[in-house]
């Protein structure tokens, strides 16, 4: 599994199935999301997990989380700090610029309680 810690510019990926959230612990719901993106590998897509770095409230260490996600079939783990750019980005811009633009998402799946975008309780 490739691990990308974003501190500036996002990587340019293509043809990706993406799930996103904090993933501070890997519970049954998280596993189902990973299963959905992993299923897209049969279509030639990479399974990408976009995680907001919530290190102060993590249940697992970064290494534990990465190890579990790799075993579950994630190809790329993208970890990003919740910075002002993301925090103040409208949902539509986040989808266009980051998910579809930078991460090359052709498929996105999130949990039913996931919220993102300015004034929408991002992650």
What are these regions (language model features)?
Residues 1-123:
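Nucleotidyltransferase catalytic core that binds NTPs
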């Amino acid at each position: 599994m490739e691990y990308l810690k974003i501190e500036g510019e996002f990587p340019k990926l293509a043809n990706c199935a993406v799930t996103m959230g904090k993933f501070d612990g890997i519970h049954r719901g998280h596993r189902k999301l990973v299963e959905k993106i992993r299923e897209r590998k049969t279509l030639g897509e990479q399974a990408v997990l976009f995680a907001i770095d919530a290190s102060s409230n993590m249940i697992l260490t970064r290494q534990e989380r990465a190890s579990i996600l790799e075993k579950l079939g994630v190809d790329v783990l993208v970890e990003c700090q919740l910075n002002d750019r993301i925090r103040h980005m409208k949902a539509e811009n986040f989808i266009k610029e980051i998910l579809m633009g930078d991460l090359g998402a052709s498929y996105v799946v999130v949990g039913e309680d996931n919220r993102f975008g300015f004034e929408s309780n991002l992650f």
